[in-house]
Amino acid sequence: MTAWWAVVPVKDPRHGKSRLTGALDDDARAGLVRTMATATVRALLAAADVAGVVVVSPAADPLGVPDPRVVLLPEPVATDGAHVGGDGGGAGGGDDGGTRPDVPAAGLDAAVTAGVEHVRATAPGAHVVVVLGDLPDLLPAEVDDVLRRAADVPRAHVPDAAGTGTTMLTATWPHRPHPRFGPGSSARHAAAGHVPLDVPAASGARRDVDEPADLASPGTPSGA
């Protein structure tokens, strides 16, 4: 069985999840970002089909405590020296804006591409799954379920619980993902060739945290 490598883009905890500003203070928000990213990465590491995890972030400690099993890459930096990963665009910004799918303009898409290129360079032959780091309910068995559904598809994606966003993006070897993250990304990913996977609505793979209402999710850490 071909192994999967996971790419997890994580924002600087100090600036992530801006839409939760009214529900959580800055420290609580930063703590929540770290806690959710750590929970997501732990689920991936415990999944049977995942060989390794690459975290892409502008923060030196996006997981709070570094894990020796995780490769940490810096977020791509724009030519003016500013980090390209803003908070615009829901799950992380970076709408394509009409550029070629393999050359994202900036933001989350650029971070995803950096992680994918690292995997392609260091683990040739591996499949790639991009997982947003805000899935606190995600279980290892749910990760394996998604990857088994995606194993025979060149490119696929997992829609969020609302059916409009994207929580996971997959590409089997030798294909590369075409990231189109931002509001309404599920439709854009489908248009770019990532077929939607029929993952159960109750799966933690679909329950991301973006809005205050999402904090009521059973597995969501309270506060931080």
Show the residue positions of the predicted features.
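N-terminal nucleotide-binding beta1-loop-alpha1 segment
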Residues: 1-20
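A short, N-terminal amphipathic alpha-helix
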Residues: 33-50
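Acidic donor-binding segment of Leloir-type glycosyltransferases
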Residues: 50-72
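Short phosphate-binding loop-to-helix
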Residues: 66-87, 95-127, 185-188
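The conserved acidic donor/metal-binding loop of glycosyltransferases
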Residues: 132-136
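Conserved donor-nucleotide/metal-binding helix-loop-beta segment in metal-dependent transferases, i.e.
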Residues: 138-163
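Short, glycine-/small-residue-rich phosphate/pyrophosphate-handling segment
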Residues: 167-194
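Conserved alpha/beta core of the MobA/IspD/sugar-nucleotide pyrophosphorylase nucleotidyltransferase superfamily
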Residues: 184-224
